[in-house]
């Protein structure tokens, strides 16, 4: 008899068939309490859980007494209570490697869009404001040869440093929990403390997960340390930044512009002051959102769950100690 799993994300037919070859699959739209109650038997007997974005917490786990493995279609897992999974000997799998290059492309796009004011001037053209040769009011700033500061030198940080160093001849500064010798050797990146990075960088790019230590890591003090010409990019997690402090820094001219893929509350409220600022490029958490990469993430998550329920957790496991 096949193990049973709960699938709370729509998959392409070929990936669904791959799952069905190994498991009895119950598809649900979400993990809301009413959904769990409606499918109580399926949840209580499920050994696997696969999907994205929904909260996986102790209350849910209490309804899933047979659960052995959860697989998230993401690299981040701040919506999952990992400690609760580990305490119940449930492994959590994620998809860290397949989205690296795509997210780095998104960060580079935000850097270019903010510096060259692409969104702002494009909207002005559409509004019929281009009636004569443009002047300084339409100008942006250069990207090439500017100093890039990367906060969080993981896979994505490395991919961004590669683009900046080789493609735009940008000096690279970085701040991370530990020094990254490969970044220093390949890109001549310079490790520094956060304050030094903020003071010297023309672009401050945040690529951090959300943890107790990183929540509101960027607030009024940090923005005050940045150059008034600096551009701030957040492609990590929204709550890493105190959004009110960011808004104030932009309004007060403490920094030049911001490119934001993530926010404290998502979706972003329609009355957010960020949406009325011409020097802000706000996009809806599209870091990995290409057809190719999202398919690859789903395929990776499927394979992760198959492997995990066969006891294979050598790669992509967040909490391997749970299997011990």
Swiss-Prot record:
Its EC number is 1.1.1.79, 1.1.1.81. It comes from Salmonella schwarzengrund (strain CVM19633). The lineage of its organism: Bacteria, Pseudomonadati, Pseudomonadota, Gammaproteobacteria, Enterobacterales. Its main location: cytoplasm. Gene3D superfamilies: NAD(P)-binding Rossmann-like Domain (3.40.50.720). It is an enzyme of class 1 (oxidoreductase). It comes from the Bacteria. InterPro entries: D-isomer_2-hydroxyacid_DH (IPR050223), D-isomer_2_OHA_DH_cat_dom (IPR006139), D-isomer_DH_CS (IPR029753), D-isomer_DH_NAD-bd (IPR006140), Glyo/OHPyrv_Rdtase_B (IPR023756), NAD(P)-bd_dom_sf (IPR036291). GO terms for cellular component: cytosol; plasma membrane. The active site is at residues 237, 266, 285. This is Glyoxylate/hydroxypyruvate reductase B. One of its GO terms (molecular function) is hydroxypyruvate reductase (NADH) activity. Keywords: Cytoplasm, NAD, NADP, Oxidoreductase. SUPFAM superfamilies: Formate/glycerate dehydrogenase catalytic domain-like, NAD(P)-binding Rossmann-fold domains. Catalyzes the NADPH-dependent reduction of glyoxylate and hydroxypyruvate into glycolate and glycerate, respectively. Homodimer. NCBIfam families: PRK15409.1.
